[in-house]
Amino acid sequence: MRRPTLLMLALLAGCGPDATSEALPLGLDITLSRAVASQVGAYQVAVLKDGTKRNCTELQRTCLSSQVSSSDLLELKDADGNSGRTLRFPSAPGGAAMGLSVDVPVGRDYALVIEALTADTPTRFLGSSCNYLRVVNSGTNATLVAAPIELTTQSCDPVFSR
């Protein structure tokens, strides 16, 4: 069963010429339809290098972990100082809008993937949104409305090996 879910992202991010080790905040505002809110337990955020070489349609079909190597992902950091190549954020109660802050390295040509994950154990993939980030600047960036998530339960494991 497929249900489109609108995932909204406001990008307020990181600068400059090419990718550097400097990471600056990327703000994400996520809104989820209340109709599917009870199914979603968390969002997993990942940013891929070489975004224009990626096919977002293909990346959204199944777990990102089954399609790319963890070395293709940028190192991210959340507002609490947790870091990793993927970051997980619990969904807001009742599907309420939520704001996230993720430090993304300054640079160009990225693909941002947000996976909706179940609250079950083990965690299962529900669907994802993929968006191209042409440039992450040091100032305020234009707001991005993310591609809708098509909820399609898959049997893949969304966890990247560490």
Predicted regions and their residues:
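Sec-dependent signal peptide recognition
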Residues: R2-M8
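C-terminal motif of bacterial Sec signal peptides marking the signal peptidase cleavage site
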Residues: L12-G14
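Bacterial signal peptide processing site
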Residues: G16-A19
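Post-signal peptide N-terminal segment of mature Sec-exported envelope proteins
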Residues: A23-Q44
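One face of beta-strands
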Residues: L26-I30, I114, G127
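Compositionally biased low-complexity segments at domain edges in trafficked proteins
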Residues: I30-A35, S138-R162
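Residues that cap or initiate secondary-structure elements
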Residues: R34-S38, G51, R108, D120, ...
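Tryptophan-paired
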Residues: K49-L126, Y132-A146
